[in-house]
Amino acid sequence: CKTVCICSCTPICCGVLSSHQMRGLAGIARDFDRGFGHFTTRQNIQFNWIKLVEAPDILDRLASFDMHAIQTSGNCIRNVTSDPLAGAAHDEVQDPRIWAEIIRQWSTLHPEFAFLPRKFKIAISAGAEDRAATAFHDIGLRLALSRNGETGFRVFVGGGQGRTPRVARKLAHFIPARHLLSYLESIMRVYNAAGRRD
């Protein structure tokens, strides 16, 4: 099957699935794969034995329950991940899933960042404990409140777990939420222009 099978990856926004979506994914596993999929640490599900000729049918099926396979491979911004306890954690400043969704919508099919030097990973966390491992992502965002109660972010850059693992460095102690996307866009432009492509 190596010559005709492909891996299909589907992002799960913030790791949250409805029961309808879970049943839909189970149907894809049953009808197009070997009866199961693999949940990844990047909050995706992978099907590893998809026949290439069936890929259009799978994409159509995903769309029927509001899912897709956009930006799950290649040198682009990947699925934005969040704290697995987001929305329920006792120590969170605010639910980070809202911001993860905003970043996802901003980055999906962004024409300027469709061919980056390498795949690019963003994580967001809102708790005192960093359960999203933001220090090990290209951009790590930690939700914070200013002294006057304004929502913002501590921004970390340069983390990774690839062939040269490294811990991210703090780039900004506090960026107001209203400036988040323009700040991210600036980081992405620098990376796109100056990042290594070898």
Describe each PLM feature range:
Residues 1, 132-134, 184, 192-198:
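Charge-rich, low-complexity segments
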Residues 5-151, 182:
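Small-residue-enriched alpha-helical segments and adjacent helix-cap loops
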Residues 71-79, 155-164, 192-197:
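Short, compositionally biased low-complexity segments
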